[in-house]
Amino acid sequence: MIEQAVADLWLPIAVLIMRASWVSPRKGQANVSQMHYARQGVVTEEMAYVAKRENLPESLVMEEVARGRMIIPANINHTGLEPMAIGIASKCKVNANIGASPNASDAAEEVNKLKLAVKYGADTVMDLSTGGVNLDEVRTAIIDASPVPIGTVPVYQALESVHGSIEKLDEDDFLHIIEKHCQQGVDYQTIHAGLLIEHLPKVKGRLTGIVSRGGGILAQWMLYHHRQNPLYTRFDDICEIFKRYDCTFSLGDSLRPGCQHDASDAAQLAELKTLGELTRRAWKHDVQVMVEGPGHVPLDQIEFNVKKQMEECNEAPFYVLGPLVTDIAPGYDHITSAIGAAMAGWHGTAMLCYVTPKEHLGLPNAEDVREGLIAYKIAAHAADIARHRPGARDRDDELSRARYNFDWNKQFELSLDPERAKEYHDETLPADIYKQAEFCSMCGPKHCPMQTKITEEDIEGLEKVLEARGAAELTPVKLDKAD
């Protein structure tokens, strides 16, 4: 599959060849995490590569990784990976979810979804397969084909391994699956360790209860066994596993709100406090962490949610699903959530998990993946502009120049979705001659305002005329009402 990635030119060939040599000397060491090296003052090859991608000094990348404000999810067994960064100092990133369900899809289709997600700009991809196929086969196929970091939710496979019987799951089952995912090259795993048994009564006043699949599994486990969350009690053991592979924690928010009514409630905030504790525990092991967030949040509560996470979790990168800012638009939740995502990114969220038009309705197909990703690339880019990240607006300015100069092909090329931009233009003006035309079908050949080209000479000449006439002539005449 790596050979196919080279053939597809997904990655610079040098990276595919070089990363294997980067990680080879590290294998077998007790701790191979990027944070571990950064805290020793070592700039790894991954850090240097990320610094170039982000146009940041290598020293800053190392300092941010050591501090925990930046992560580089890069399992040493995922050698076909192009290193990337998630953190407040880097550009806002977008994750795409794919995965087979018991009712739909197979390994080949999921790899095709991966390719589509990468094509449309996914910075990371999560495999959320829950059953119906050989989960290990699907996961390894995705990892082998992927140039971007791959994330998983191991509790799904833990439950599948006992054929859905919660009562048969024990603590070792969870840890066995977690290590298997690390061995296969998973770069980050959603670990729902922040949901405690004492949190469960706090969901009583909610409209939608627990909407996290992983959180729901662990809630059922605790209710059946009347014991504490095993991912919490065995958290240090998970850290020991993660640091051997440089797998990153994505601390799951099991109690994220599933509707506007439940946003920022006691259950959500109680779990967030525990996630802060777990972040610091992972850092003691030099293990990288990002923290997951809601969900469904009204616009006026988004800033509070981002700042609260930064406060509780010591500014570990925040990774949010949406959030959706209204609940009344099934079929359009890529829009309702992209609105919230842009605002969350503006306030400091490091990565946005895309939502597709199929959210709450069904398993996304290829077109849904495209629609969701483009919506979220827009949101992330808007956040980068709002945060004044260096170079964030360069592409906008270049496209605007092309638009003003009626350079249609350049406009298409610079678009987030060049195929869609060209398709819409060509619906009414398909002939090649119209690629040089100084109009589109909206205004036609005579009414496009951008045909009015005002030069510096025009302005200078006008200024001289105005100066000669004097300001008095330019003062508006007040007419009497009778006139």
From Swiss-Prot:
It catalyses: 5-amino-1-(5-phospho-beta-D-ribosyl)imidazole + S-adenosyl-L-methionine = 4-amino-2-methyl-5-(phosphooxymethyl)pyrimidine + CO + 5'-deoxyadenosine + formate + L-methionine + 3 H(+). One of its GO terms (biological process) is thiamine diphosphate biosynthetic process. One of its GO terms (molecular function) is zinc ion binding. Pfam families: ThiC_Rad_SAM. Its cofactor is [4Fe-4S] cluster. Its EC number is 4.1.99.17. InterPro entries: ThiC, ThiC/Bza_core_dom, ThiC/BzaA/B. One of its GO terms (cellular component) is cytosol. Catalyzes the synthesis of the hydroxymethylpyrimidine phosphate (HMP-P) moiety of thiamine from aminoimidazole ribotide (AIR) in a radical S-adenosyl-L-methionine (SAM)-dependent reaction. This is Phosphomethylpyrimidine synthase. It comes from Parasynechococcus marenigrum (strain WH8102). The gene is thiC.
